[in-house]
């Protein structure tokens, strides 16, 4: 079992945000030997020449000095570029909508960074994620954070037994409001800092402008399912399934808004439908690849559980059928809207995250089931 806290070295990944600040504070209060480390994964100021990494590191430095723990920075720009950003671009080239946060946790935080922490002699790697780990029936389990609105197990679904045996999530059992209150009570400089949103390497920048720096946009036609041209799109990569905003199509026809329903990569056509309950927006199942399970015990060929197809979505009842290798078919109990290839599908049994995969394609008709 765990050693005495004072003899236990914990490296905590610090982002300059309030969550990792309070996580570090909690570890220090519990008596652990804590080292704060800031990961530099991206080296590029925004279009105004402003580098948020410099400000974030300054916040890490000030918090660590307030708490009284040593702090360092480590550079994973090369690994991040190769493992996360290239994947991000490749998925967009395929007309899909990737989730770089899942890949960052898999390849950077709980791989490259974990290895770095262990080389420093750490017993554990801690982060400010809203998630929990426990040990039951001879295995580690990944459990949802108690703050259901902030739970981040969706992004941590690729963690296995080894990673969980080394992971600590000090604020997983606290809700966000309490985290802010703790930061304020200790006068941490990050107490009132707003939460970061969106994709980390884009930050507050315009997504379209950012992506166009790396992938040439190919404008094309927007059509309805009958083939009628409804407008122009700036590039398929700028659109995701179920999208309503930014299409620039007036409410012609029934007057209802238009939604993205599919992409024809070969002919560079964006297909749209009218009305938020249009049948074509719904799917009945999906095929997933790159499956990963938290448990190392044998998984049944067919089982029922709940799943999320996007972050913060309420759990949906599904039946999972393993189809060999790292693939599966997921059948929905009821039709689901805007399930998007490239995103993660993550499975749950009650509070436990079972694992997940990448949505490869959707099943559009009952006949395909």
Swiss-Prot record:
The keyword Ribonucleoprotein does not apply. One of its GO terms (biological process) is tRNA wobble position uridine thiolation. The active site is at residues 104, 200. Its main location: cytoplasm. Keywords: ATP-binding, Cytoplasm, Disulfide bond, Nucleotide-binding, RNA-binding, Transferase, tRNA processing, tRNA-binding. CDD domains: MnmA_TRMU-like. The keyword Transferase applies. PANTHER family: MITOCHONDRIAL TRNA-SPECIFIC 2-THIOURIDYLASE 1 (PTHR11933:SF5), TRNA 5-METHYLAMINOMETHYL-2-THIOURIDYLATE -METHYLTRANSFERASE (PTHR11933). NCBIfam families: PRK00143.1, trmU. This is tRNA-specific 2-thiouridylase MnmA. It comes from Alkaliphilus metalliredigens (strain QYMF). The gene is mnmA.
